[in-house]
Swiss-Prot record:
The modification Asymmetric dimethylarginine is found at residues 3, 18. The lineage of its organism: Eukaryota, Metazoa, Chordata, Craniata, Vertebrata. CDD domains: HFD_H3 (cd22911). The modification Allysine is found at residue 5. It is found in: Nucleus; Chromosome. Core component of nucleosome. Nucleosomes wrap and compact DNA into chromatin, limiting DNA accessibility to the cellular machineries which require DNA as a template. Histones thereby play a central role in transcription regulation, DNA repair, DNA replication and chromosomal stability. DNA accessibility is regulated via a complex set of post-translational modifications of histones, also called histone code, and nucleosome remodeling. The keyword Ubl conjugation applies. It holds the Pfam family Histone. The modification N6-acetyllysine is found at residues 5, 10, 15, 19, 28, 57, 80. The nucleosome is a histone octamer containing two molecules each of H2A, H2B, H3 and H4 assembled in one H3-H4 heterotetramer and two H2A-H2B heterodimers. The octamer wraps approximately 147 bp of DNA. This is Histone H3.3C-like. Belongs to the histone H3 family.
Length: 136
């Protein structure tokens, strides 16, 4: 037989399906699994943490610059009209507001995670209302 050249292909890394053993017809039957398998589910919170990680690594603003600038100008008009802002001032306001939001949401996240792990399905603002004495 003549030798021929073969091109190398990268392996896809997939597993080769195993051959099914032939079961003898002596009364033994294979368990029927009708192809129904459960979908893979991650533990609660795993997917949320995976979505958070890119935002933790990044250093850019999470709020878009122009909508934030419009909001700042709109709020400032309530106090005084015809105000002008330097771009550095708006950038500083945006950094401060995002830092505040991150701290605020982190504290809420920790309380929500603690509530999730304790399996307590109550809400703090409702508990405060329950503790108040009812007027007679």
């Amino acid at each position: 037989m003549a030798r021929t050249k073969r091109t190398a292909y990268k392996s896809t890394g997939g597993k080769v399906p195993r051959k099914q053993l032939v079961i003898e017809a002596a009364g033994k039957s294979a368990p029927s699994t009708s192809g129904m398998t459960k979908p893979h589910r991650y533990r609660p919170g795993t997917v949320a943490l995976r979505e958070i990680r890119p935002y933790q690594k990044s250093t850019h603003f999470l709020i878009r610059k122009l909508p934030f600038q419009r909001l700042v100008r709109e709020i400032a008009q309530d106090f005084k009209t015809d105000l002008k802002f330097q771009s550095a001032a708006i950038r500083t306001l945006q950094e401060a507001s995002e830092a505040y939001l991150v701290v605020f949401l982190e504290s809420k996240q920790h309380s929500n995670l603690a509530r999730m792990y304790s399996q307590n399905k109550s809400f703090p603002w409702l508990e405060g209302k329950r503790r108040q004495p009812q007027p007679m």
